[in-house]
Amino acid sequence: MLLDDKMKVSVAVPVFEYYGRGVEVLDDMLRTISIQTLKEVEVVISDHSINNDIENYCQKNEYGLNIRYIRNVDGRGNPAINTNNAIDNCTGEIIKVFQQDDFLYDTEALEKMYTIMTESNAKWYACGCIHTRDDGHSFFNEMYPNWHDRMILDPGFNFIGGVSVLSIKKEVKTRFDPNVRMCLDVDFYYDAKVKYGMPILHHDVLIANRVRDSDTLMSEVSEEETLEEFKYCHQKHGIVK
């Protein structure tokens, strides 16, 4: 399928080798995009991989999707840089941000999101999500997005969810900060709220998040590093605790 300039939704996907499962988890996501009721969709893939596995997979395009593949050598290993690159290359009216290992839970997910956003003056949006430990064979812990002012103040108050619940209108200029990892989502949410107002908080489960027992970001970042990230965000945004 050819890319064109009439995309309603762009799905921005930063990818890497993902511990040897990069193609496998990306395939799950693309499969769920291929069965969406909304068809005017492009998938923008920004690839931090060193090998060619994902590029070769995208070239096959087995689901016949509008795929825009970009090999990204800048800031390799930094999720913010890779995500921003995917967003910056999107052409759709609405940009749906997606972590590589997550996937759509509802075949009408993109259509619901697009309709709600285009009928609202709000510039950004978060939906509900559900979790899986076994690659979608079973699900648990539905989560619905809610705003909490302590989100940017202290760890443990992100009641919106991870970045895969996020969608923005194309005119939104907020981007992810390359200087943070644990605060990547809450820093973006706070900045977007300051610049664009409250998001649409859509209490419908549209996204499935994979939960990994090992190799998680939380195991890679110490509590001290997390607290330092929050201090950095406070200084950046002029927040006094």
Where are these predicted regions, by residue range?
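C-terminal, non-catalytic tails of nucleotide-sugar-dependent glycosyltransferases
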Residues: M1, T216, S222-K241
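Acidic donor-binding segment of Leloir-type glycosyltransferases
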Residues: L30-D74
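Short, well-formed alpha-helical segments that are part of the catalytic scaffolds
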Residues: Y18-I35
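Conserved nucleotide-sugar donor-binding catalytic segment
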Residues: A12-V13, N146-T226
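Glycine-rich, basic loop-to-helix element that forms the pyrophosphate-binding segment
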Residues: V73-C90
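Short beta-strand-to-loop acidic/aromatic patch adjacent to the donor-nucleotide binding site
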Residues: G92-F103
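Conserved donor NDP-sugar-binding/catalytic core segment of glycosyltransferases
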Residues: E108-F139
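Acidic donor-diphosphate engagement hotspot in glycosyltransferases and nucleotidyltransferases
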Residues: V25, I54, D106-K112, G136, ...
